[in-house]
Amino acid sequence: MTLVILTILILAYVLIATENVTKVNRAAVAIFAGTVGWVLYICFGMDFVTSEHSEDYTRFLNFSEMESTSTSVKYFISRHIFLPQVGRAAEIVMFLLATMTIVEILNNNGCFDFVRQLLRTRSSKKMLWTLAIVTFLISINLDNFTTTVMMLTMMHSIIPSRRQRMVYGSAILVAANCGGALTVIGNPEGLVLWNSGAVTATVFSFSLLLPCLAAWLIPTLLMQRMLPERVETEWIVMPFRGDDTRLNKWQRLLMLLVGIGGLWFIPTFHNITKLSPFLGALCVLSVLWIVNEIFNRKLMNMDAMVERRTPRVLQYGVVQMILFVMGMILAVGVVKET
């Protein structure tokens, strides 16, 4: 049965890697692999428990004064094997949920509008490198998926040419993935390694610094040659914030510092308290939430906070990403227990 479960996991990885070909959502595949794997595990639980957890199972029987039956095995698996795996998965999911909510609060209050001001140029090279550098730096602090969606949405509203959009979009994707890979909070994979204690935040970043810079700079230099001297742009007037937020520049800057600075503080929080990183992320979220309530107090009292500017693709994509991470952690967990 171990071979069957392992085969399911391998097939799931293949389907995830070929998502563009199969058109099957990777989150659905991950959730299916995780749930089916655990169902098979508990159906043949006696073999796995006696081979991998015999001492723990014996102590469980002695403590609970139960006989070794299929029911007691299932109870042992659900309480002492399955729940710890769910706990590990929940830690990652809660961290992602907290950080993505932080991004939503910042985005709704216009804290990233400064990026549009930096992009006011007709030079294609300057536009390319500004997009790439800003995306790289933001993805270091936020997760790469959220950064990609946010920057692509912004770029799409500025550049009308389809061909130029493809080049700038590719640069954004490369920068977001390389920036996200540089820190433990930049992508789910690094977060899983850090949360499991396999790496430390400092060693992780220093080890990947040169590879990430090379993987980012070399493709961007090559893409630079594909652009004309001048870039075609169209600037849409910034939307009136009467129904969204009335924060001034300094209030937005303060919220940005609280959000981004708080995310940077999470590794320190983990090292000092030894508590799970998601608790630090929730702490940052709560502080930012309070600041948001204070700054928008008058607007909330007027019941005017009805329009949100977060792209729908981001909202739907966040749910998919969380389900995908949850499914993959459960799938890997069941293989680990076999």
Give residue ranges: language-model regions:
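Membrane-interfacial loop-to-helix junctions in multi-pass transporters
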Residues: 1-4, 89-92, 119-133, 159-168, ...
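Juxtamembrane and boundary regions of transmembrane helices in multi-pass small-molecule transporters
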Residues: 4-6, 161-166, 170, 182-183, ...
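Transmembrane helical segments that form the transport core of multi-pass membrane transport proteins
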Residues: 57-67, 87, 109, 113-118, ...
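Short helix-coil transition sites and intra-membrane helix breaks within transmembrane domains
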Residues: 22-23, 103-113, 138-150, 179-187, ...
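Intrinsically disordered, low-complexity non-transmembrane regions of multi-pass membrane transporters
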Residues: 4-8, 14, 44-78, 226-258, ...
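Structural signature of hydrophobic alpha-helical transmembrane segments
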Residues: 1-8, 87-98, 140-148, 178, ...
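Hydrophobic transmembrane alpha-helices that form the pore/transport pathway of multi-pass ion
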Residues: 126-181, 192-195
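Interfacial loop-to-helix junctions that mark the boundaries of transmembrane helices
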Residues: 1, 21-26, 53-62, 75-92, ...
